């Protein structure tokens, strides 16, 4: 039985008539082609972008950690602060699963959040048949469906296989979409969001609020919503979702383990397709905390860790193909290991938390591979302190 609960402002969870057509069209286009088109568009704007040099780490104490996190929250949300009490505007329970072939699924709930005129956040709560009491946020990037290839080969973006593996191990999954990258609204247009007027704080808030408000609901409404009372929260994201994972884990220390996949590298190493959309390089934001600082914030704390996964043969961004060895002064892996070493040393000085970089040598393109899921993400989750 389906139950609709309007928590805040009313807006029906309507699915326009073109929704199914968009969904079918998205599935017909090979993800590698989508990644290639996306990278070409990014390269075309690269020459006009001047990136901040973020190679210097500015966090040296726990006081710095607190101050940086507070400064980021103030930048993103202004005087309103982090939305720690806001819930989704609408919750629809027991919806048809948007992802096929999930053997260990008990139920799916749908969350919708009205963020601005014409801008609605969407997330799905996949409840495991045999819950282990923990939940993983899985954040998509520049794709509009989680229902990609379910097979044993490394095909597609890897969202379906990630959900299936997490459910198999008993983890609840919160699947979250980027702004304007969801069923019913696959228009993109992230750069245009930074031209919006009357935004309190920064448009970056629209990338983070669907996760924040959905987690608020999951942390407080288990009895009323008839779902497991989760005791630990983790996060995985691909591409733009990997960027979201990096930033969200830096801001919200309740994320214990985080796994940004093909999502970011420091700005000083970026060229071409690795530059990304505006949220990836907005100077006023990264002047507060560059990427190495964000990695520290996302990993620092008792029992916290961040494992960043890059794909060597990435067809979009942050792989060897997108690396400028001449500009960096060193080969791809050496350059990546350089910032990993800096972040690890800084965390060692702070005394709590761990950071590690994995370069996926098996994935043939822009994706979460079976290797990343089975040999990196799941073992790290299962070994996390409890």
What does each model-found stretch correspond to?
Residues 133-142:
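Short beta-strand element of the alpha/beta-hydrolase
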Residues 238, 244-284:
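Hydrolase active-site cap/lid region
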Residues 190-239:
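Gly/Ser-rich "nucleophile elbow"/oxyanion-hole loop immediately N-terminal to the catalytic nucleophile
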Residues 331, 337-386:
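C-terminal catalytic histidine-bearing segment of alpha/beta-hydrolase fold enzymes
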Residues 10-16, 24-31:
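Short, low-complexity intrinsically disordered segments enriched in A/P/G/S/L with frequent Arg
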Residues 88-130:
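N-terminal cap/lid segment of alpha/beta-hydrolase-fold proteins
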Residues 266-349:
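The feature captures the conserved acid-bearing segment of alpha/beta-hydrolase catalytic domains
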Residues 141-209:
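Cap/lid segment of the alpha/beta-hydrolase catalytic domain
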């Amino acid at each position: 039985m389906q139950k609709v609960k309007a928590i805040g402002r009313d807006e029906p969870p309507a699915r326009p008539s073109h929704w199914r057509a968009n969904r079918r069209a998205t599935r017909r286009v090979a993800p590698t082609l989508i990644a290639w088109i996306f990278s070409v568009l990014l390269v075309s704007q690269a020459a006009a972008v001047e990136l901040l040099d973020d190679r210097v780490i500015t966090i040296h104490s726990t006081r710095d950690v607190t101050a940086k996190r507070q400064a980021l929250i103030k930048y993103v949300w202004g005087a309103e602060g982090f939305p720690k009490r806001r819930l989704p505007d609408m919750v629809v329970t027991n919806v048809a699963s948007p992802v096929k072939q999930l053997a260990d699924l008990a139920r799916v709930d749908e969350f919708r959040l009205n963020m601005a005129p014409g801008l609605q956040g969407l997330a799905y709560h996949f409840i495991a048949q045999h819950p282990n009491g923990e939940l993983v946020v899985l954040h998509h990037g520049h794709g509009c469906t989680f229902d990609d290839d379910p097979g044993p080969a490394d095909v597609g973006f890897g969202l379906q296989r990630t959900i299936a593996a997490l459910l198999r191990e008993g983890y609840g999954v919160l699947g979250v979409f980027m702004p304007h990258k969801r069923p019913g609204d696959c228009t993109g247009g992230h750069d245009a969001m930074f031209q919006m007027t009357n935004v309190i704080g920064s448009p970056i808030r629209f990338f983070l609020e669907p996760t924040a408000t959905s987690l608020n609901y999951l942390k407080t409404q288990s009895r009323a919503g008839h779902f497991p009372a989760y005791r630990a929260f983790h996060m995985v994201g691909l591409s733009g979702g990997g960027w979201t994972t990096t930033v969200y884990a830096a801001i919200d220390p309740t994320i214990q383990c985080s796994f940004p996949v093909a999502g970011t590298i420091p700005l000083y190493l970026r060229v071409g397709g690795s530059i990304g959309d505006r949220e990836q390089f907005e100077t006023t934001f990264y002047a507060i905390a560059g990427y190495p600082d964000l990695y520290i914030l996302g990993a620092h704390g008792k029992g916290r860790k961040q494992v960043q996964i890059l794909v060597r043969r990435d067809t979009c961004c942050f792989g060897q193909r997108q690396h400028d060895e001449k500009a960096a002064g060193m080969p791809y892996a050496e350059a990546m290991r350089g910032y990993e070493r800096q972040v690890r040393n800084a965390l060692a000085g702070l005394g709590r938390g761990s950071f590690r970089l994995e370069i996926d040598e098996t994935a043939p393109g822009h994706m979460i591979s079976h290797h990343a899921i089975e040999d990196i993400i799941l073992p790290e989750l299962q070994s996390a302190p409890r």
